[in-house]
């Protein structure tokens, strides 16, 4: 559906830097900008094109008709969108921010008519941050949500060609595409991304409260359970606080299950129900990632109802693995 292959990345930390590398690997013409002198110097030192400031990068994007990708913390989105409106007001726009509904709302407030926006979010990362933590293969095999929100609000919905371009970028970066609405993404991410950061923080603090002996005994289960607690605190705050409503719902669910486990342990001396439920849930997760072939279908983006069909399939856990012209190959 699209042959465009030019990409402007705003933000060159872990995710933005990895997108720039992966897109370059796939043959895109790429450049970026960042407010971090450290990341700018590191990227330029590896031969990447780094514009002197965000405005310069966006003006080049406007001149070259490039896709613009925002890879900044949620707290910086409003300022960057103001720059987009000033320097590239009719661009094709996406983002990789960890929350989608609040970003869409910010787009409504700041962009001018003619901006064509499709939100996205790769579900990949590490506990480290910055350009040095990124790599071209960070997204290989990872799910990458590409929003399928519709409706008449042109400030937060682009045409199918832009959706295909963003999905094509995700596929070129090595990911598979999961179609979902912004609200569906935020509800799911609260449970499988944002809540784990809070639980890891609590687990790390509880372990530390046990004193030097407890930390000396910390091994695999403690290390695995607290890995993301090593992430930059301000980045975690931006992600979690930006998804407050959905995260509170997920946290209530977790607290309810922890309360049930405590009650069972206190009254019976056992925790069988909690452990069995968690074991089965983990096995189901592993099976969903195991590559079992449940068949595939094709969805032609030019047919009526195509985006709603993709949303329905994404809701069932299906993923787009290839894009041939206007046809999406969807694995069930």
Show where each model-derived region lies.
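Rossmann-like NAD(P)-binding element
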Residues: 54-94
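NAD(P)-dependent dehydrogenase/reductase Rossmann-like domain
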Residues: 258, 265-267, 271-332
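NAD(P)+-binding Rossmann beta1-loop-alpha1 motif at the extreme N-terminus of oxidoreductases
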Residues: 1-53, 59-62
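Phosphate-coordination loops involved in phosphoryl transfer and adenosine-cofactor binding
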Residues: 3-6, 90, 141
């Amino acid at each position: 559906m699209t042959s465009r292959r030019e990409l402007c990345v705003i933000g060159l930390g872990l995710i933005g830097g990895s997108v720039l590398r992966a897109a370059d690997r796939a043959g895109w013409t790429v450049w970026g900008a960042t407010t971090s002198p450290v990341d700018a110097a590191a990227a330029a030192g590896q031969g990447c094109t780094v514009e002197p400031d965000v405005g310069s990068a966006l003006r080049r994007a406007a001149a070259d008709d490039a896709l613009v990708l925002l890879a900044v913390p949620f707290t910086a989105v409003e300022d960057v969108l103001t720059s987009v409106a000033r320097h590239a007001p009719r661009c094709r726009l996406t983002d990789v921010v960890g929350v989608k509904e609040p970003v869409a709302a910010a787009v409504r407030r700041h962009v001018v008519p003619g901006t064509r926006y499709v939100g996205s979010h790769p579900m990949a990362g590490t506990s480290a941050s910055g350009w040095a933590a990124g790599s071209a293969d960070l997204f290989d095999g990872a799910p990458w949500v590409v929003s399928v929100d519709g409706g008449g609000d042109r400030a937060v919905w682009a045409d199918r060609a832009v959706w295909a371009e963003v999905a094509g970028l995700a596929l070129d970066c090595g990911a598979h595409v999961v179609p979902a609405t912004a609200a569906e993404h935020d509800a799911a991410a609260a449970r499988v991304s944002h809540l784990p950061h809070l639980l890891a923080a609590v687990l790390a603090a509880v372990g530390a409260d046990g004193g030097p002996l407890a930390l000396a005994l910390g091994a695999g289960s403690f290390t695995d359970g607290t890995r993301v607690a090593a992430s930059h605190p301000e980045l975690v705050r931006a992600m979690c606080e930006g998804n407050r409503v959905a995260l509170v719902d997920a946290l209530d669910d977790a607290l309810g299950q922890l309360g049930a486990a405590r009650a069972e342990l206190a009254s019976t001396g056992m925790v069988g129900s909690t452990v069995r439920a968690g074991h089965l849930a983990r096995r189901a997760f592993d099976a969903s990632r195991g590559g079992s072939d449940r068949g595939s279908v094709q969805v032609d983006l030019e047919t009526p109802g195509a985006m709603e069909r993709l949303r329905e399939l994404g809701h069932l856990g299906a993923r787009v693995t290839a894009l041939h012209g206007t046809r999406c190959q969807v694995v069930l």
